[in-house]
UniProtKB/Swiss-Prot annotation:
It comes from Brucella canis (strain ATCC 23365 / NCTC 10854 / RM-666). GO terms for biological process: succinyl-CoA metabolic process; tricarboxylic acid cycle. The gene is sucC. ATP binds at residues 46, 53-55, 109, 112, 117. Residues 9-254 form the ATP-grasp domain. It catalyses: succinate + ATP + CoA = succinyl-CoA + ADP + phosphate; GTP + succinate + CoA = succinyl-CoA + GDP + phosphate. Its EC number is 6.2.1.5. This is Succinate--CoA ligase [ADP-forming] subunit beta. Substrate binds at residues 274, 331-333. Pathway: Carbohydrate metabolism; tricarboxylic acid cycle; succinate from succinyl-CoA (ligase route): step 1/1.
Length: 398
């Protein structure tokens, strides 16, 4: 689960992280009212959407030369003018896709005199099985580009969960970020704070880009991105309350109600598969034969007829779907259950696109019999290769 920048910064501030004074607003009137409470004379007006690259993004409704989703303002009047342009409009960034995301709220905060911009994140380093800090002196930019062009400028420090952030760890991080004087003191205090927040709140990612050193020599969290482990949310009702459903795909929201692993994609062939590995292999082979998957959907190992029916409805609700591939290997999951679920869903919502079903494993013959005797126009496939070729051909009209 993701949260907005202003929510992430407030959360980190409760642990003691230094942030600027700021407020989230939902209207131009609120922007004016609350900007007057900030000291100024420099303000930052930030679009609040669940996507990176906001500063370089573009609003669909504005001229091509208009400013992006993060803007500086030197007066309350400029704050208001920017709010009028940003609220309600659609911001397109490298992470939103062409559709973009509508900006429904802004975060207005004090400006800062920046001397240096740094990068810091905490994530789970699966190569060592530990949380790890990833830091760089090249902050305020795309860290992926830094990793590709100048990987030597990225330093990773794995943390022993039994010890937490030790003095040695903190000094390694401070050295990697070239912190000195007051900035070093701030950093040595900040690193354990961030690690505590990461572990206590079951975060999967904590990213600060940039972490700034100001001209007064102090450190401040200028931007923050936080993602939480969905499997641990039951322990954090306070975090669940921060969820913004308007930022999520409606199909993914519906899938979560049935405990389905669903991710919407940009293709035209809907996929229903059991098992994440098989689901990814299915998407790969669809691409191999010249089409694009419309989704990742893993119904899991113990799906019921009702769960399969719900999955099918979610796939068919996507107007971009021109064909559906059901690919099931019955281990824990039984092929007859899948067959019954698919038939129930087709009878309920109708079948307007080609449907290819490949079943293998437990009760496969019974599953095939159920489908064959259903009277539905379903294309049967013998293996994954055959299934992918048939659905691609059906969609292309071959």
């Amino acid at each position: 689960m993701n949260i907005h920048e202003y929510q992430a910064k407030r959360l980190l501030h409760t642990y003691g992280a230094p942030i600027a004074n700021g407020v989230a607003v939902y209207s131009v009137e609120q922007a004016e009212e609350w900007a007057k409470t900030l000291p100024g004379p420099l303000y930052v007006v930030k679009s609040q959407i669940h996507a990176g690259g906001r500063g370089k993004g573009k609003f669909k409704e504005l001229p091509a030369d208009a400013k992006g989703g993060v803007r500086l303002a030197k007066s309350v009047e400029e704050v208001v003018a920017n709010a009028k342009e940003m609220l309600g409009n659609t911001l397109v960034t490298k992470q939103t896709g062409e559709a973009g995301k509508q900006v429904n709220r802004l975060y207005i905060e004090d400006g800062a005199d920046i001397e240096r911009e740094l990068y810091l994140s905490i994530l789970i380093d699966r190569s060592v099985g530990r949380p790890a800090f990833v830091v760089s002196t090249e902050g305020g930019m795309d860290i992926e580009a830094v990793a590709e062009e100048t990987p030597e400028k990225i330093v990773t420090v794995a943390i022993d969960p039994a010890k937490g952030v030790t003095d040695e760890d903190a000094n390694k991080l401070a050295d990697a970020l070239k912190l000195e004087g007051g900035a070093r003191e701030d950093g040595l205090k900040l690193f354990p704070i961030l690690y505590k927040a990461f572990t206590e709140k079951d975060m999967s990612l904590l990213e600060i880009n940039p972490l700034i050193v100001m001209t007064n020599g102090r450190v401040r969290v200028l931007d923050a991105k936080v993602s939480f482990d969905n499997n641990a949310l039951f322990r954090h009702p306070d975090i669940v309350e921060l969820r913004d459903l308007t930022e999520e795909d409606p199909k993914e929201i519906e899938a979560s109600k049935y405990d389905l692993a669903y991710v919407a994609l940009d293709g035209n062939i809907g996929c229903m598969v059991n098992g994440a590995g098989l689901a990814m292999a299915t998407m790969d082979i669809i691409k191999l034969y010249g089409a694009e998957p419309a989704n990742f959907l893993d119904v899991g190992g113990g799906a019921s007829k009702e769960k399969v029916t719900a999955a099918f409805k979610i796939i068919t609700a996507d107007p971009a779907v021109e064909g559906i591939l059901v690919n099931i290997f019955g281990g824990i999951m039984k092929c007859d259950v899948i067959a019954e679920g698919v038939i129930a869903a087709v009878k309920e919502v109708g079948l307007k696109v080609p449907l290819v079903v490949r079943l293998e494993g437990t009760n496969v013959e019974l599953g095939k019999k159920i489908i064959n005797e259903s009277g539905l126009n379903v294309i049967s496939a013998d293996d994954l290769d055959d299934a992918a070729q048939k659905i691609v051909a059906a969609v292309k009209g071959n």
